[in-house]
């Protein structure tokens, strides 16, 4: 048996099983993310939320997914059918593909590569193409204009996200996500984590993640309270479901990055409790709860306000933070407190 797993066939089978496990975990989480999102929103508005299908409404997401799947796929006249169907599939698969390098525990990662951060950015940057393709292939000017606005929004906030992560890379001296989590280790639990020295960037990263995922209050392209759905206006049935799934998976990816970069990943917040994958899941769900609460309580921004805050506030702040962290690391200024965080751990 050991010889089989060491052979190319065994390696291929191992990668296949790991890939299926990642897909099962993310898609299983997706079902309860949609349910939790609706329940939290309902609680803030003093409603019950989903409560009909299954106990406590737990099967409501399955019923909604089935409803989308059995509906007719209406293709607009003159649409590019190949690109029309490729766009939602591409959006979902790229978001799912990024989880290949996400470690849930020590050794619990499908591909423990040294450029994990770059891999995630490459995958997330390509998601813009799915949005553009979906708007263009619909053969309608309104979805196409919405896709351009959405692409501009996503690209704008990717710049800030990248600069924020550069600060973490300087502090840890690595782009390997497992190494970044290991750099959080220490005798003081959560006080050793990078949220403390990089606290302003935690706030900027969270808000930028909202804009990157088209989540409220930055859901200007496909606001749920409006009559149209932005670049997805001409989509229905399963393709529309794939677009929705891609957005939730991308949001879950941002929750994972927040947990790994700033909050110790699978490390325990207190030294006397064992580390484990459950801490990673708890932290991801905490950040998802924060995403849902923002959706429920924060009013929507105008598009000009969204772009202004991205380019005139977040970009200068994140760039200035990179310069500050680089200076502290290079000259070992403020040794003691910053020596632990700004000189490669």
Swiss-Prot record:
Q: How does it sit in the membrane?
A: Multi-pass membrane protein
Major subcellular site: membrane
TM region(s), chain numbering: 15-35, 82-102, 115-135, 161-181, 190-210, 240-262, 278-298, 309-329
Q: Name one GO biological process term.
A: aerobic respiration
Q: Which UniProt keywords apply?
A: Cell inner membrane, Cell membrane, Membrane, NAD, Quinone, Translocase, Transmembrane, Transmembrane helix, Ubiquinone
Which locations, inside or outside the cell, does it occupy?
Cell inner membrane
- What's the catalysed reaction? a quinone + NADH + 5 H(+)(in) = a quinol + NAD(+) + 4 H(+)(out)
Q: Which residues form a coiled coil?
A: none
Q: Which domain of life is it from?
A: Bacteria
Cited Pfam families: NADHdh (PF00146)
Query: EC?
Result: 7.1.1.-
Query: What cellular component terms from Gene Ontology apply here?
Result: plasma membrane
What GO molecular functions are on record for this protein? NADH dehydrogenase activity; oxidoreductase activity, acting on NAD(P)H, quinone or similar compound as acceptor; quinone binding
Family, according to the entry, reads as follows: Belongs to the complex I subunit 1 family.
Q: What's its job?
A: NDH-1 shuttles electrons from NADH, via FMN and iron-sulfur (Fe-S) centers, to quinones in the respiratory chain. The immediate electron acceptor for the enzyme in this species is believed to be ubiquinone. Couples the redox reaction to proton translocation (for every two electrons transferred, four hydrogen ions are translocated across the cytoplasmic membrane), and thus conserves the redox energy in a proton gradient.
PANTHER family for the chain: NADH DEHYDROGENASE SUBUNIT 1, NADH-UBIQUINONE OXIDOREDUCTASE CHAIN 1
* Assembly and oligomerization: NDH-1 is composed of at least 14 different subunits, Nqo1 to Nqo14. The complex has a L-shaped structure, with the hydrophobic arm (subunits Nqo7, Nqo8, Nqo10 to Nqo14) embedded in the inner membrane and the hydrophilic peripheral arm (subunits Nqo1 to Nqo6, Nqo9) protruding into the bacterial cytoplasm. The hydrophilic domain contains all the redox centers.
Q: Spell out the protein name for this chain.
A: NADH-quinone oxidoreductase subunit 8
Look up and give the organism this protein is from: Paracoccus denitrificans
Lineage of the organism: Bacteria, Pseudomonadati, Pseudomonadota, Alphaproteobacteria, Rhodobacterales
Q: Which gene encodes it?
A: nqo8
């Amino acid at each position: 048996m050991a010889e089989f797993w060491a052979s190319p066939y065994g390696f291929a089978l191992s990668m296949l099983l790991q890939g299926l496990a990642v897909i099962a975990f993310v898609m299983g989480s997706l079902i309860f993310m949609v349910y939790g999102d609706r329940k939290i929103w309902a609680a803030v508005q003093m409603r019950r939320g989903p409560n009909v299908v299954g106990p406590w409404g737990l099967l409501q997401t399955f019923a909604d997914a089935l409803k989308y799947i059995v509906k007719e796929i209406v293709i607009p006249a003159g649409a590019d059918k190949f690109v029309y169907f490729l766009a939602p599939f591409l959006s979902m698969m790229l978001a799912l593909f990024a989880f290949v390098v996400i470690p849930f525990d020590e050794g619990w990662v499908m591909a423990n590569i040294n450029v994990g951060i770059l891999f995630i950015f490459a995958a997330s940057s390509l998601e813009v193409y799915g949005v553009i393709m979906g708007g263009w292939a619909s053969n309608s000017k309104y979805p196409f204009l919405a896709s351009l606005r959405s692409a501009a929004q996503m690209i704008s906030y990717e710049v800030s996200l990248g600069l924020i992560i550069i600060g973490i890379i300087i502090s840890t001296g690595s782009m390997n996500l497992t190494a970044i989590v290991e750099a959080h280790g220490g005798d003081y639990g959560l006080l050793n984590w990078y949220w403390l020295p990089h606290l302003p960037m935690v706030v900027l990263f969270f808000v930028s993640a909202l804009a990157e995922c088209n989540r409220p209050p930055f859901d200007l392209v496909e606001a749920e309270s409006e009559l149209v759905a932005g670049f997805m206006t001409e989509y229905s049935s399963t393709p529309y479901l794939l677009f929705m799934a891609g957005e939730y998976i991308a949001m879950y990816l941002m929750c994972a990055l927040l947990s790994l970069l700033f909050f110790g990943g699978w490390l325990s917040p207190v030294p006397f409790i064992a580390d484990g994958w459950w801490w990673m899941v708890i932290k991801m769900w905490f950040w998802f709860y924060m995403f849902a609460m923002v959706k429920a309580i924060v009013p929507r921004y105008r598009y000009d306000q969204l772009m202004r805050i991205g380019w005139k506030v977040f970009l200068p702040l994140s760039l200035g933070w990179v310069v500050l962290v680089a200076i502290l690391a290079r000259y070992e200024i403020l040794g003691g407190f910053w020596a632990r965080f700004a000189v490669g751990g």
